[in-house]
Curated annotation (Swiss-Prot):
<comment type="function">
    <text>Calcium-binding protein that interacts with rotavirus cell receptors once the initial attachment by VP4 has been achieved. Rotavirus attachment and entry into the host cell probably involves multiple sequential contacts between the outer capsid proteins VP4 and VP7, and the cell receptors. Following entry into the host cell, low intracellular or intravesicular Ca(2+) concentration probably causes the calcium-stabilized VP7 trimers to dissociate from the virion. This step is probably necessary for the membrane-disrupting entry step and the release of VP4, which is locked onto the virion by VP7.</text>
</comment>
<feature type="glycosylation site" description="N-linked (GlcNAc...) asparagine; by host">
    <location>
        <position position="145"/>
    </location>
</feature>
<keyword id="KW-0325">Glycoprotein</keyword>
<comment type="similarity">
    <text>Belongs to the rotavirus VP7 family.</text>
</comment>
<dbReference type="GO" id="GO:0044166">
    <property type="term" value="C:host cell endoplasmic reticulum lumen"/>
</dbReference>
<feature type="binding site">
    <location>
        <position position="231"/>
    </location>
    <ligand>
        <name>Ca(2+) 2</name>
    </ligand>
</feature>
<feature type="binding site">
    <location>
        <position position="229"/>
    </location>
    <ligand>
        <name>Ca(2+) 2</name>
    </ligand>
</feature>
<dbReference type="InterPro" id="IPR042210">
    <property type="entry name" value="VP7_2"/>
</dbReference>
<feature type="region of interest" description="GPR motif; interaction with ITGAX/ITGB2">
    <location>
        <begin position="253"/>
        <end position="255"/>
    </location>
</feature>
<feature type="region of interest" description="LVD motif; interaction with ITGA4/ITGB1 heterodimer">
    <location>
        <begin position="237"/>
        <end position="239"/>
    </location>
</feature>
<keyword id="KW-1038">Host endoplasmic reticulum</keyword>
<keyword id="KW-0167">Capsid protein</keyword>
<feature type="binding site">
    <location>
        <position position="301"/>
    </location>
    <ligand>
        <name>Ca(2+) 2</name>
    </ligand>
</feature>
<keyword id="KW-0945">Host-virus interaction</keyword>
<dbReference type="GO" id="GO:0046872">
    <property type="term" value="F:metal ion binding"/>
</dbReference>
<keyword id="KW-1152">Outer capsid protein</keyword>
<dbReference type="Pfam" id="PF00434">
    <property type="entry name" value="VP7"/>
</dbReference>
Amino acid sequence: MYGIEYTTVLTFLISFILLNYILKSLTIMMDFIIYRFLFIIVVLPPLLNAQNYGINLPITGSMDTAYANSTQEETFLTSTLCLYYPTEAVAEINDNSWKDTISQLFLTKGWPTGSVYFKEYTDIASFSVDPQLYCDYNVVLMKYNETLQLDMSELADLILNEWLCNPMDINLYYYQQTDEANKWISMGSSCTIKVCPLNTQTLGIGCLTTDTTTFEEVATAEKLVITDVVDGVNHKLDVTTSTCTIRNCKKLGPRENVAVIQIGGSDILDITADPTTAPQTERMMRINWKKWWQVFYTVVDYVNQIIQAMSKRSRSLNSAAFYYRV
């Protein structure tokens, strides 16, 4: 009996000593690995000359678009400003160094060289199909064109607000808008939109669901269409899907890092009448039409007042981000 107890105690002591030895061995081994790893980290960096791809990107958001006057020297920048302008401005100025001149003028207003990026677009129609707003602050210059009033106002509504959008299958389903913030947004080379409102028996109201020629045409061959119909009523839609994509969208609120400046025009575009616009003070302003040199001088002169009406955001906007906001 006593022999069994002694054997048990002896076995326990041997197990304890063996476990203690194993733990000490593991501790010594881990200390060796950790200290060797730290030694390598401390010694190697001064000997290497590799690029750190994380510090030379002054623009927040997507970097898919190359910017004409980008620089990799200003790694300390905390804010970036993108200035969007039509191609006609470049043609009129006709000066290969005009961007450098404007950049130096922005420097006098506190914007370091390399923090201002110039982005050219062909026209309002093409810009509305694929808006790309990547900077902390984005200022879009739109020269007034009487024939493009609708495109200009809808583009302003698109880029001055954030939207959550989902695909629509108009061949299988009827759609209705739930409230005033719910819109259908179409983009493409040519968008013609027709709608047929339905009653509770899914019969057309003033139209035949089997005959699209009886549908109400709300847009014809446009690049960008924001369709607003009567809330709470199902609609059958007919869209030129071969050249246009339509999405079911919800306006979430203002995109406060974007401002639109209308250049010239007797009529002032104003989207603040939209009841879904909150707050009612929008970042949309107008300056008188002058030569493009004078336009850029005016923007430089008032850039800081313009920025004060905006808020810095890191979320970028392009056609993909517009469709699927994350």
